């Protein structure tokens, strides 16, 4: 799997303007990601998701995040996440390693 420290830098650069990871963190433009692993799409309490996100019905894990983060709009057509994605697989692996740790603390 990826490098947690590199993943943290990627999160700060590409994700933190819209997402928080800490327990009890507030929703921003995107939902708080605490507890992400093992949760189904569109399930963060108190966040207003698109029907596309709620109806996707997958459970977030390393494999689903690897695919989603490459091209979010392709993976969930109709998502309001405007992020274009991370094309480099090793960068996605680093980000996922960080998320796995940070969203579970």
From Swiss-Prot:
Superkingdom of this protein's organism: Eukaryota
GO BP, sorted A to Z: apoptotic process
Keyword Chloroplast: no
Modification N6-succinyllysine, positions: 56, 73
Keywords attached to this entry: Acetylation, Apoptosis, Electron transport, Heme, Iron, Metal-binding, Mitochondrion, Phosphoprotein, Respiratory chain, Transport
Chief site of localization: mitochondrion
N-acetylglycine: residues bearing it: 2
The name this protein goes by in its record: Cytochrome c
Source species of the chain: Oryctolagus cuniculus (Rabbit)
Encoding gene per record: CYCS
């Amino acid at each position: 799997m990826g490098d947690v420290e590199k993943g943290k830098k990627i999160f700060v650069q590409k994700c933190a303007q819209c997402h928080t990871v800490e327990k009890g963190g507030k929703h921003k433009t995107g939902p708080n990601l605490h507890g992400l692993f093992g949760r189904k799409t569109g399930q963060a309490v108190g966040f207003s998701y698109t029907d596309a996100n709620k109806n996707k019905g997958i459970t977030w894990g390393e494999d689903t995040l690897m695919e989603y983060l490459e091209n979010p709009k392709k993976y969930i057509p109709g998502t309001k996440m405007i992020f274009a994605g991370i094309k480099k697989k090793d960068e996605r692996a680093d980000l996922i390693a960080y998320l796995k740790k940070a969203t579970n603390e």
